């Protein structure tokens, strides 16, 4: 039975960099929204000697996620790891759109993989530095459980809370809330994964040199670099190394936690105040 790693958002900079690392000892299945981009990414990986394939998946549709995992399992393949990098940033849509993709999409991927997970399997959810450091009074954490039971109500609460500041900040706040949710939800699901002998973690990137990272940098996110310890954008390979390690069998005791990979941004913010 061949070990398989599924990577959502697989054609992006983070996804491809992770595929190159995991592809040394895993069969790779890429998932994204555009088949042409998937096909091009698969050709690229195969040229490097990686056993790769891919299929379209809409993570906001649970049936589409189930179809993705069935595709990955076809032919007696076992999904050893899922690295869930798919998501959107504030500049890519409305507050509701951001909440749906980042939060509800994560629920769908997590629940679908949990139903299949066995001893030694791992799920790595990508959160964000934006999910850290928000005032607790601002984060609608009481609504987080609704993402599982009533996603429509969850989205409405996120959108409503994102309106506490000016319109320009609506999507940004929704993004921060959605990523705080990913961190919370990945911790919440640790026991369920553990009951199957499997692991779940979240990883929170800071500012990275990817298409999405550049988009946000052009709209003010680059200001965070001024307070960071390293004073530069992270390289896709640097975050991929962490994602691939978490997805591998090496950190067998690592679960139910978040790993912050932000070049010292949060540390800089904290100690700048002191």
Where are these regions (language model features)?
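Catalytic loop of short-chain dehydrogenase/reductase
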Residues: 88-92, 122-195, 207
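Conserved glycine-rich Rossmann-like NAD(P)H-binding loop of the short-chain dehydrogenase/reductase
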Residues: 25-40
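Short C-terminal tail/terminal secondary-structure segment
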Residues: 255-274
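Short, flexible catalytic-loop segment of classical short-chain dehydrogenase/reductase
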Residues: 132, 204-215
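Conserved glycine-rich cofactor-binding loop
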Residues: 11-12
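The beta1-alpha1 cofactor-binding region of Rossmann-like NAD(H)/NADP(H)-dependent oxidoreductases
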Residues: 56-67, 103-106
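Short, small/polar-rich loop/turn modules that mediate ligand/substrate recognition or access, typified
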Residues: 194, 199, 254-256
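C-terminal helical subdomain
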Residues: 108, 174-175, 180-183, 202, ...
């Amino acid at each position: 039975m061949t070990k398989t790693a599924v990577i959502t958002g697989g054609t992006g900079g983070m996804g491809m960099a992770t595929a190159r690392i995991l592809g040394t000892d895993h069969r790779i299945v890429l998932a994204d929204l555009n088949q042409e981009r998937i096909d091009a990414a698969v050709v690229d990986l195969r040229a490097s000697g990686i056993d790769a394939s891919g299929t379209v998946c809409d993570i906001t549709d649970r049936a589409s996620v189930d179809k993705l995992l069935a595709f990955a399992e076809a032919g007696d393949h076992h999904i050893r790891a899922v690295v869930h990098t798919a998501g959107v940033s504030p500049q890519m849509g409305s507050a509701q759109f951001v909440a749906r993709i980042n939060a509800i999409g994560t629920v769908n991927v997590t629940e679908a993989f949990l139903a299949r997970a066995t001893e030694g399997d791992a799920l790595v959810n990508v959160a964000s530095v934006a999910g850290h450091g928000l005032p607790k009074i601002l984060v609608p954490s009481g609504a987080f459980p609704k993402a599982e039971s009533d996603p429509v109500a969850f989205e409405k609460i996120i959108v409503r809370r994102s309106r506490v500041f000016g319109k320009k900040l609506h999507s940004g706040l929704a993004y921060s809330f959605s990523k705080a949710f990913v961190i919370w939800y990945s911790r919440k699901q640790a026991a369920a994964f553990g009951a199957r002998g499997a692991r779940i973690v979240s990883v929170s990137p800071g500012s990275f040199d990817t298409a999405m990272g550049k988009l946000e940098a052009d709209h003010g996110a680059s200001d965070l670099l001024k307070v960071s310890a390293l004073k530069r954008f992270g390289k896709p390979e640097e975050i991929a190394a962490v994602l691939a390690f978490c997805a591998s069998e090496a950190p067998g005791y690592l679960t139910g936690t978040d790993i912050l990979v932000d070049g010292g941004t949060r540390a800089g913010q904290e100690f700048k105040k002191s």
